[in-house]
Each structure stands twice: as structure tokens, then as C-alpha cells.
Regions:
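Short, structured active-site "lid" loops
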Residues: 68-96
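Short, well-ordered beta-strand segments
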Residues: 7-9, 57, 98, 116, ...
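Alpha-to-beta junction loops
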Residues: 86, 91-100, 182-192
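A conserved helix-loop-strand patch within extracytoplasmic ligand-binding domains
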Residues: 102-103, 111-162
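Small-molecule-sensing regulatory modules
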Residues: 2-60, 65-66, 73-75, 158-322
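N-terminal winged-helix
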Residues: 14-21, 25, 78-81, 107, ...
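Short acidic active-site motifs
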Residues: 85-86, 135, 174-175
Length: 322
């Protein structure tokens, strides 16, 4: 086995491959810089005179094969659909690491694996892509909007309660084709995904995070590896972003408290300003949208998320009693 050979596991969609290619690119770039400066820090186990050799391995997940509405897929959570087979290959030592969209990751990480690195975050917002270039406020009554997320459905109806929501599945290009073929008047997609596949020009309207909250972790890349693989863990440290990690921890903690998934109407977003973590959260259920924001120390992201969740739950209880 070559010392410098690394296999990255990824789904086969254009978006997943673009994300994996980006991670491959920055790993090679950082490694070459260390090689040039002969400064490898604590990284061990590589032939420091040779370049990294990185291969992408496409792994088909259950979510790629089963395109039914999420609510009709039994025996697994929605988030397990896109990672389980990849995690299995990692545990069997068939791949060294995997690149995931954080918002697709389950709360529970399998024993032996570690969410080790959060190298970057793209725009966390959602966007409207309409067939005729109309913004949300300009769409006709009873226009058909495509989304597979209860959060997006609730946020859409909070802004326009005279729209028809229709489920949609598939990758970005599949969804855009369904839109262009006339199945929908508009669809909602993550800005991050559109940008990463070079389709930001299709965006009709960017939604403001206060009025249309993104999913926790939206736009963040997560790199997973084996917990006992010190060689890969040390390598991933060179591309980890501490700010993104803090945002990840805050938003994942918020999601965990509300048992967040595509069937849970919650949203969360954060920004880092110096040593301050600014966190926004939304819970939208039973016809009532609760939105709160809070600021805390970036060194204590989970604590900040817990305080925000507590404020939202307090408001929810008040509504139920009133």
C-alpha cells in the first residue's frame, strides 16, 4: 500500500463530486506547501518526498436509489439515507475519509468514526428558483412550489399562505429539470449547492435568514474518518477551519435539542464576529413561528445553542398555556 495514497468516499451526484474534488484540491495544495517548506508539524506516516495521491470513490447510498417522498421511506431516518453505506465502507477500511454535506449527517456518529474536520462554509441561505423569473411575492395564487423539507414548507406558507406545496426529490439537476418541464412553478434549493455546481445564475431570489431560516449546518462541509486513524486525523487538521467548527457545534447542538431532521420544522444559522458567536433559531409548528437570536462566546458554542433553544421552548410553552 502506498504511503501517500488516500481514498475519499463520496456520493456520485455532481454536487457531491464537486465537494469532494474541492477537498482533494485543498489537501494537495496544503500538503505541497508543507513539503516545499519542509514543515510537516505533527503529521506522520507519509513519504514526505512524494506528493499526495488522492482517489475519489463513488458510493451509491440508499437515498440515491430510493427517490420516494421521504415520509414514505421506512426503516431509517431521512439523514441515514445519504451516509450509511459510505460509513460502512470506512469502517471496513475501503476508504480513508468521506466528504459530506453537514446538513445530511445524522446526530449520532457510528462507533469508530469521527466527524473530524469542517474546512469551509458556503452561503447558508435558501433560494427560490422560479420557472418564469418571478420572486415569491410575484407568484400567482395557487402556484406550485417544490420542496421535500417540512421546514421549507412551513417557511414558505408563513410568507405566502396561498401557495401549493408539492414534494420533490432528486439531485439539483433533476429538480431543475422537473421545474423546467413544468411540474412546478418554483422550487426551493440551498444557495450553497447551486454555487458549488456553478448554477447560481438560476437563483431568482435569495431568502433572508430572519424570514426564511436555513437548516442547521447548511453550507458546511464535514469530513469524516476513522477515530483511530491518527495519520488521517492529523492531515485533516491542516484544513480545518476553527470558525466553521464553532458554527457547526452550535447549530448541531440546537438541532439535537429539537431532534432536528427534514421532518422537524426548525432552522438555525450563525456567524462569528471576533470572539462572539451570533446564533439565530426558528421553530415553526402548530401555526406559530417562533424566532429568536442570541449572542455568546465562540469558545462555548454548545452553551449558546442551549440558551437559544431554552428561550424558544419557553416561548412555545407560553403559547400552549395561553
Amino acid at each position: 500500500m502506498k504511503l501517500n495514497k488516500i481514498i475519499i468516499g463520496t456520493r456520485g451526484s455532481i454536487l457531491a463530486l464537486a465537494q469532494a474534488e474541492k477537498v482533494k484540491e485543498i489537501l494537495i495544495e496544503k500538503y505541497e506547501k508543507m513539503k516545499k517548506n519542509n514543515d510537516f508539524g505533527g503529521i506522520k506516516g507519509f513519504d514526505k518526498n512524494s506528493p499526495l495521491e488522492i482517489e475519489l470513490k463513488v458510493i451509491i447510498t440508499k437515498g440515491d436509489k430510493d427517490l420516494r417522498d421521504f415520509t414514505k421511506i421506512k426503516g431509517t431516518t431521512q439523514k441515514d439515507l445519504f451516509v450509511k453505506e459510505i460509513e460502512k465502507e470506512m469502517l471496513e477500511n475501503k476508504i480513508d475519509l468521506a466528504v459530506h454535506s453537514l446538513k445530511d449527517m445524522p446526530q449520532q456518529t457510528p462507533e469508530g468514526l469521527l466527524n473530524a474536520c469542517f474546512p469551509m462554509r458556503e452561503d447558508s441561505r435558501d433560494a427560490l428558483v422560479s420557472r418564469n423569473g418571478e420572486k415569491l411575492s410575484e407568484l400567482s395564487e395557487n402556484s406550485v412550489i417544490g420542496t421535500g423539507s417540512i421546514r421549507r414548507e412551513k417557511e414558505l406558507l408563513n410568507l405566502r399562505n396561498n401557495l401549493k406545496i408539492k414534494a420533490i426529490r432528486g439531485n439539483i439537476h433533476t429538480r431543475l429539470k422537473k421545474l423546467d418541464d413544468g411540474e412546478y412553478d418554483a422550487i426551493v434549493l440551498a444557495v450553497a449547492g447551486l454555487k458549488r455546481v456553478g448554477l447560481a445564475n438560476r437563483i431568482t431570489e435569495y431568502f433572508d435568514t430572519d424570514s426564511f431560516m436555513p437548516a442547521p449546518g447548511q453550507g458546511i462541509l464535514c469530513i469524516q474518518c476513522r477515530e483511530n486513524d491518527e495519520k488521517i486525523r492529523k492531515l485533516l487538521e491542516i484544513i480545518n477551519d476553527d470558525k466553521v467548527t464553532a458554527m457547526c457545534e452550535a447549530e448541531r447542538e440546537f438541532s439535537k435539542i429539537f431532534d432536528g431532521g427534514c421532518h422537524t420544522p426548525i432552522g438555525c444559522s450563525s456567524v462569528i464576529d471576533g470572539n462572539t458567536l451570533k446564533l439565530k433559531g426558528m421553530y415553526n409548528d402548530n401555526g406559530r413561528r417562533i424566532f429568536k437570536e442570541i449572542a455568546g462566546n465562540r469558545e462555548n458554542p454548545k452553551e449558546t445553542a442551549q440558551k437559544l433553544a431554552k428561550e424558544i421552548k419557553k416561548e412555545e410553552i407560553k403559547d400552549e398555556e395561553g
